[in-house]
Amino acid sequence: MEKPILQYNNGVVAAKLDRTEKELVCGVSFHIFPGESLALIGETGSGKTLIAQSIMGVLPGNVSLVSGEISFCGNTLPKGKKLRSMLGREIVYIPQNGHEFLDPSRSIRRQLFDSIGKLGVAPSLRYAFACEKLAQVGFAQPEAILKQYPFQLSGGMAQRVTIALALCSEAKL
């Protein structure tokens, strides 16, 4: 039987406030199999981002995953440096606000080419590869997007560029 890429079992995320602990997310469980998509839906402040941050090991300083188990490809998700080394290669996070992720001083082309280069794609093929990824996320004229800088993009366009960057990583999650 096929293993889930990600299993999040009975996760509880809590914040330490003075000498007390306040549960922010309680008893969340889900799994994602290869080829599946999962949407975390909830009101503002309901903990969707905290769940994603707990998977990536980047919770704010006074917040932690206090119980539950997270596994990635059948193994307990590592912590610390080992987990950080997986981010961007095996696990990619697409932020709600693409402008926060993109470097405003570098063209979209440069940012995509950097990601594509990490895949080992030959320099002569990077332009076509970048255009293909931008087309996959709905840009009718990817060549024009490559020439732009993040500040020239709308919020939705910036988010689609971050999705294209994630597709360039060929991460599992």
Residues of each region from the PLM?
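Conserved ABC ATPase "signature" region
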Residues: 125-144
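ABC ATPase NBD coupling module
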Residues: 64, 76-92, 118
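The feature captures the beta-strand-to-loop junction immediately N-terminal to the Walker
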Residues: 41-43
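Q-loop/switch helix immediately C-terminal to the Walker
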Residues: 97, 104-118, 129
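Conserved ABC ATPase signature
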Residues: 148-153, 157
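A short, proline-enriched helix->beta-strand linker immediately N-terminal to the Walker B motif
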Residues: 168-172
